[in-house]
């Protein structure tokens, strides 16, 4: 089936296996119920997927709805990290119609897997019933601003206020939550202000720097020149001259914030668990390509 719905080209595709071994620093399995993502984030690293899928359409204008054989033995993934939404958002608006992510969660019940859901949507609250049954589940929302105008410039996903409200609802349902401040835009993202808004409803507060590479580097640099011309010298230093001092200073700032609020400060994610309300673990995920295998030692792979 192929049709255009609300300006999005929708295809239904068959796949042999929905579970894919992950190359992410968090390891385990990467699971993407869709190909493509209709949030159309201007800075999206996942746009590189077009090289492998053969899509000619602009990123954000297409979505492949996957059909896969039912997961017959979910216990196979016991103790494994399963990341849902590494190169898509399983809760894109089309999920309301197709229900792929809900179907996936139903098939993973009883797996005892350590499930991480990455989203920019409030639709996830629909599935709180399943999240409770799954047990070891973490839901992460990307929130890198409190400014809805900047957010709207960057993506067409749920509003920041809706994401924060969904986080609160999921947290209060007893499910571990993450505020993923990603990507941190130099001179724009105020992570301390975001922390103040979410610290009582998240267990982890991740910080990741804006990476600019490939085709979207020019898109973002042009956006900064047009909307924030005063930041052009800073972006030139970071992204053309590869000066890391800005983000190194933010690391120091984040560690001070952790001490102020009596929060753990680590360079990778903690093992599954909850923390006292108001004291989320602050995760220094800046330059995360250096983190793999460090096991929170603070000694990165430079």
Task: Report the location of each language-model feature.
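Glycine-enriched alpha-helix->loop->beta-strand junction motifs that scaffold or abut catalytic
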Residues: 133-139, 199-204
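Hydrophobic faces of well-ordered beta-strands that scaffold small-molecule active sites
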Residues: 29, 82, 115, 139-141, ...
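Auxiliary Fe-S-binding modules of radical SAM enzymes
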Residues: 2-14, 192-302
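Conserved Radical SAM active-site core
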Residues: 1-138, 146-149, 160-161, 165, ...
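Conserved strand-turn element in the central/C-terminal portion of the radical SAM core barrel
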Residues: 156, 168-189, 240-244
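Conserved beta-strand termini and adjacent loop/short-helix elements that scaffold enzyme active sites
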Residues: 120, 142, 266-270
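Conserved radical SAM core fold
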Residues: 83-92, 122-125, 137-157, 186, ...
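Anion (oxyanion) recognition and catalysis
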Residues: 109, 171-172, 199, 259
């Amino acid at each position: 089936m192929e049709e255009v719905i609300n300006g999005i080209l929708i295809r239904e595709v068959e796949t042999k296996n929905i579970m894919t071994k992950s190359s992410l620093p968090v390891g385990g399995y990467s699971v993407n119920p869709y190909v493509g993502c209709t949030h159309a984030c201007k800075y999206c690293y996942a746009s590189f997927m077009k090289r492998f899928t053969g899509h000619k359409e602009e990123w954000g204008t297409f979505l492949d709805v996957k059909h896969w054989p039912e997961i017959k033995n979910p216990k196979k993934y016991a103790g494994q990290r399963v990341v849902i939404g590494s190169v898509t958002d399983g809760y894109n608006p089309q999920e309301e119609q197709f229900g792929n992510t809900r179907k996936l969660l139903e098939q993973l019940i009883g797996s005892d897997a350590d499930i991480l859901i990455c989203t920019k949507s409030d639709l996830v609250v629909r599935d709180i019933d399943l999240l409770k049954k799954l047990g070891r589940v973490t839901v992460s929302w990307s929130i890198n601003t409190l400014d809805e105008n900047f957010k709207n410039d960057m993506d067409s996903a749920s509003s920041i206020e809706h994401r924060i409200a969904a986080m609160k609802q999921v947290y209060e349902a007893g499910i571990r939550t993450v505020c993923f401040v990603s990507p941190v835009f130099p001179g724009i993202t105020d992570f301390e202000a975001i922390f103040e808004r979410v610290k009582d409803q998240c267990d982890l507060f991740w910080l990741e720097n804006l990476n600019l590479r490939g085709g979207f580097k020019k898109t973002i640099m042009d956006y900064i020149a047009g909307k924030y011309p005063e930041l052009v010298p800073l972006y030139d230093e970071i992204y053309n001259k590869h000066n890391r001092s800005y983000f190194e200073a933010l690391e120091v700032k984040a560690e001070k914030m952790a001490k102020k609020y009596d929060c753990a400060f680590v360079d990778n994610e903690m093992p599954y668990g909850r923390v006292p309300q108001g004291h989320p673990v602050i995760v220094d995920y800046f330059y995360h390509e250096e983190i793999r295998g460090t096991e929170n030692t603070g000694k990165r792979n430079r």
